Amino acid sequence: MSLQHIVLFSFPRPLSEQEAATMRAMIASWPKEIGLMSKCRFGTDLTGERTRGYGYLLYTEFPDTGALREYQKHPVHVQFLNWVMERECTPLAFDYHLDQSTILAPEPDTAARP
């Protein structure tokens, strides 16, 4: 059963432009370097007004819990995790299955679009 893995990242100080670019580049490499995920998104909040100090969000989907576990152990992910922890990041992670009880509005059928 597929699942969604979401992580919010809070750093004790704002990342520099270079650090933010490095973080994004590391995550952007995952679809090619790690694979395993069916979706990978990363961004910042539009206003920062309601984030309670969490400045970045990572959104991924995996086909099953086995793929998530492989991703978590993958050397490229471990390197990223070490990088954020070196910057005293406080991550907040949430994983849940995607099924009839959690998908409240299905994605539109993109194949039907012109």
Where are these regions (language model features)?
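Short S/T/G/P-rich N-terminal loop/turn motif that feeds into the first structured element of a domain
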Residues: 1-56, 63-73, 89, 96-114
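Short, flexible helix/strand-to-coil boundary loops that buttress conserved ligand/catalytic motifs
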Residues: 72, 81-84
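Nudix hydrolase/Nudix homology domain
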Residues: 83-86, 94
